[in-house]
Amino acid sequence: MSTFVNDTVEDAIKTPELDQPFEALGLKDDEYARIKEILGRRPTDAELTVYSVMWSEHCSYKSSKVHLRYFGETTTEEMASKILAGIGENAGVVDIGDGNAVTFRVESHNHPSFVEPHQGAATGVGGIVRDIMAMGARPIAVMDQLRFGALDNPDTQRVLPGVVDGISHYGNCLGLPNIGGETVFDDSYAGNPLVNALCVGTLKVEDLKLAFASGTGNKVILFGSRTGLDGIGGVSVLGSASFEEGEERKLPAVQVGDPFAEKVLIECCLELYKAGVVVGIQDLGGGGLACATSELAAAGDGGMRVNLDNVPLRAENMSAAEILASESQERMCAVVTPENVERFLEICAKWDVTCAEIGEVTDEKDRYVVVHNGEVVIDAPPSTIDEGPVYNRPVARPENQDELQLEGEIARPVDVEEIKAAWLKLVASPALASRAFITEQYDRYVRGNTVQAKNANAGVLRIDEETNRGVAISADASGRYTKLEPNTGAQLALAEAYRNVVSTGARPVAVTNCLNFGSPENAGVMWQFKEAVHGLADGSKLLGIPVSGGNVSFYNQTGDEPILPTPVVGVLGVLDNVEQSIGNVLPSEDNDLYLLGETFDEFGGSIWQQVSGAGLNGLPPVVDLLNEQRLADLFVGSDLFAASHDLSEGGLGQTLAELAIHADKGMDVDLSQIHPSLFTSLFAESASRIVVATNRGEELEKRAAELGVPVFKLGCTNDSAVIAVKGADVEFTVSVEELREAWTNTLPEAFGHAVGANAVVA
């Protein structure tokens, strides 16, 4: 038993005027007053800690709830019919047919990754994997969305190697393939990097698990790693506040991960599920035991009593508040019927997983009681802990938004040599250069079910070895577009993720998101947030695919400067047969090349605008989601395509370069019908476009015409190792080797040819 002297409920009643450090825990004056009103007294230290954790921005969504409701308001019955678990659960779960379900979610670990890059990123992977485990699923793959400051910024040089090393170390040790992602460099992320991790898992429909505590007398069992002092205050210290300059040393609030412990925990959980001994389950992530137990209690049909004296600890004399707020990793909390406790403990012992019975479900409805050292340190309604306050914060369009949307001048090369130089400059830019320097550290093919990963439009995985049924997943975002017009920016992210999935031949079925924004106390940021939510919700409704869940990360700023608003959007698609999926590597034999979709003179927020020094201004490309649907109708179930590659940042020039580099193929292309300006044809970033390779051009042209998809023949591939480009009145050539050298050298040169302990440079 701990020798720590607790502040008990009895003490709180006797000392009502005791000063408490509620502000240091992130609570406002009115929130503290509300807690006292709920309890009818001052809170104990443990109660104050639990309320501060659960009412933090990270856990309560108190500034975003009023806007997130719009996702539910725009979800039709038809859209919701395939969602087995949606918004509010640990992860969205989608019924994909044949008794199979897929769960996926993306979550942020931004602030911890700035403070301690390796552990912050590693535990971000571990946390999202446990979210998937808590749904009753086996995790099968991860992805990541990373944002850093400018490539030459000293802070980027400090943070990126640790983040990449953390992701690769944890994911590789778990034996989970990393099947895709994005890495973006922009000044706005200096001092506040974004580390968003996505995980996907599979399960049988009947094996779905949910987070609730029901059944009076059922036991609450904590299992996994022991509880220590790491990560205390993570969600309130790091997840709910912005950084000031020089605040990178908030180390006590950063969790420490052990991937080998999590790997064992995965197998232990799966055996527990198979044995049928779990009534409800919750992972321990942000908010630790305080969050897990209070959420289980709030979602159940009774109350809960927890005895902290039974919690396995790895530090001596921990207070009740410390035990509850600890964010030690690799822990789960389960509700188990009394008759199944023995079997539960046996399975944990088999896997050498530490476990302990720490409480039980009671018949005291909406009562959450916690005991430590034999004394009651918490006695509160769990519903008030779980629900938290809801703020409808001021929303105001920024005063400079109109000025920002004015189209500025950009350099427009006309001379052949200038256009060629611009092309090489673009592919070599930090925005578009090869990410192999990073991704080669990730194991993409472990488990043997990865069909597409490296340089693919979307990650493709087989989930059923007998039927070859599979899924395609893509996650995308553009902070530059969203800064210019948040509603359109969010829809462009949705459109790109949707198009990436479609270009593999998969049928999109669901959406997830991670919304990364600045301070919610800034009315301009809240306008960006509201507009982005509405854009994403309206876009998902138009496409007919539901938002199955998501995450919000506020306070992403350094001082008063917020990051670019960055709504990361993930789309999940289903493939009936992964062997028929469409890749993005040109076949060895020559094929005709076609461009699907129209090209307009759209450079607002483009990479060319950034690389040419024109800043950020204008309007982003027009998004037409009906055009995206027409592309889906053309691709899903089709066998017309030998390869495909969507167009996004960098436009057609970037797509042609990547196709040629990956296959070491040359090509002859005539762009005179794409746009009168060769420069615009190559570098504009119009949406709803895909380049395809096919030897069945006439069939493609006929089918595209039937669906209303604009189609332009570009030319054909060859073995010349040269791209020959023809415009309306100019022609030039560029060798594939020139493009490859420009594309591959940027990151290795910037980081001295090594990133982290696991670096393997291709």
UniProtKB/Swiss-Prot annotation:
Record has Nucleotidyltransferase as a keyword: no
Chief localization: cytoplasm
Subcellular location: Cytoplasm
Catalytic function, reaction form: N(2)-formyl-N(1)-(5-phospho-beta-D-ribosyl)glycinamide + L-glutamine + ATP + H2O = 2-formamido-N(1)-(5-O-phospho-beta-D-ribosyl)acetamidine + L-glutamate + ADP + phosphate + H(+)
Binding, Mg(2+) 2: 131, 283
Positions that bind Mg(2+) 1: 107, 551
Binding-site list for substrate: 108-111, 130, 255, 327-329, 553
Classification via InterPro entries: PRibForGlyAmidine_synth_PurL (IPR010074), PurL_linker (IPR041609), PurM-like_C_dom (IPR010918), PurM-like_C_sf (IPR036676), PurM-like_N (IPR016188), PurM-like_N_sf (IPR036921)
Spans through the membrane: none
UniProt subunit comment: Monomer. Part of the FGAM synthase complex composed of 1 PurL, 1 PurQ and 2 PurS subunits.
Protein name: Phosphoribosylformylglycinamidine synthase subunit PurL
Organism name: Corynebacterium glutamicum (strain ATCC 13032 / DSM 20300 / JCM 1318 / BCRC 11384 / CCUG 27702 / LMG 3730 / NBRC 12168 / NCIMB 10025 / NRRL B-2784 / 534)
Gene designation per UniProt: purL
